[in-house]
Curated annotation (Swiss-Prot):
NCBIfam families with a match to the protein in the record: DnaA, PRK14086.1
Family, similarity comment: Belongs to the DnaA family.
GO BP: DNA replication initiation; regulation of DNA replication
Free-text domain note: Domain I is involved in oligomerization and binding regulators, domain II is flexibile and of varying length in different bacteria, domain III forms the AAA+ region, while domain IV binds dsDNA.
Pfam families referenced in this protein's UniProt entry, alphabetically: Bac_DnaA, Bac_DnaA_C, DnaA_N
Subcellular location: Cytoplasm
SUBUNIT field: Oligomerizes as a right-handed, spiral filament on DNA at oriC.
GO molecular function: ATP binding; ATP hydrolysis activity; DNA replication origin binding; lipid binding
PROSITE patterns: DNAA (PS01008)
Protein name: Chromosomal replication initiator protein DnaA
Annotated region (Domain IV, binds dsDNA), positions in chain: 335-456
Swiss-Prot/TrEMBL keywords: ATP-binding, Cytoplasm, DNA replication, DNA-binding, Lipid-binding, Nucleotide-binding
Amino acid sequence: MDADLNKLWEKTLNIVKSEMSEVSFNTWIKSCEPISISDTSIKISVPNSFTKDILDKRYKSLVANSIEAVCSKLYEIKFIIESDLNNEDELNNSDNSDKNRDKNSRRNIVVNDEMSSTLNPKYTFNSFVIGNSNRFAHAASLAVAEAPAKAYNPLFIYGGVGLGKTHLMHAIGHYILQNNTKAKVVYVSSEKFTNELINAIKDDKNEEFRKKYRNVDVLLIDDIQFIAGKERTQEEFFHTFNELHDANKQIILSSDRPPKEIPTLEDRLRSRFEWGLIADIQVPDFETRMAILKKKADVENLKVANEVMGYIATKIKSNIRELEGALIRIIAYSSLTNREVTVDLASEALKDIISKKQGKHVTIPSIQEIVANYFNLKIDDLKSQRRTRNVAYPRQIAMYLSRKLTDMSLPKIGEEFGGRDHTTVIHAYEKISENLKSDESLQHTVSDITKKVSQN
């Protein structure tokens, strides 16, 4: 960020901190970062919509008045959700026109001056929590960052919403720029790529558009699945991909599904997406969820007991955003009610979220039924002592999913599968986990069954 804006913010924080409790300051203000300043307003990045709502309702005037006390000028305060910075052109567009553009594009992030790349400073390899669910994707991303266009090109990362795909993409960009400040790195969402193409066609600036995206060393495109069905965008990206790949430039793509499952994607693009390495990120297991919560608490300087984090990790399983959001919600609830953070308080704070999730409770019998139907077996076959491959492998998949999708203990899972020992369950879980890293057919099978279980 601009040096003057940095000094202004530091002095502002000192005033704000004196007007708030330590818990409230750490919860709401500490994670905020000023993005830009114009003649009339200051834009401030906030981590999520919940924090933005609280700041708008309770602390906006305090921040504005504190800034006025520092610089003797009253600015309009605009809180902007961090994730929106990637989807909207907040960093490159001023409030008025080109006159203020330079002021409003300042931010404390590593970017190449020649490009309009936007990388989140918080998304680095150091801040990424590694677990069984993302270890392969992390290793692949680091390998690409260490040797762009020499390891895997393209790198295609896929997984559900909020599992860390964008984090890894930004981390790759940061790592490359830190080791080569002259590298031209561009990160963009597929939606923004499409919108810029539309504007380029409308304004007859096709060559400028092509120069921007083809004259780079590293191109990172998030949510590439959204170009499916857009013929002109696919045509343009096909040629962009070819030119970059032929020039030995690195391409990194992310999606919510593997290339072969993206509908209405042209075959020529699908095949190119599969040229390099495809790495998936799965829903984090309990141990990884705990590690994520501890990391978040450390970064935000939050004091939360292990039993409370254990409660959150048990109840919130879907994705990292919800997990971290639940922690912030609990801290906020504690701050607003002036109560200590306990499991009981956590239960109160998350009751609405938990009640919605419990409406879709997954059981081992439901998993067994769906797996049995999928493989044309009977549930009794999964519980039997038969060891033929046509029974044993589906049984291992069912055990794996029982471990992933339920709260049942290993002994309980073993009991549900014909009274098997918990070590058998561990073996099944580890075998399927390992095979998922390289077996695309198994990846499709597990994904398909998981969807059926969630819809059941």
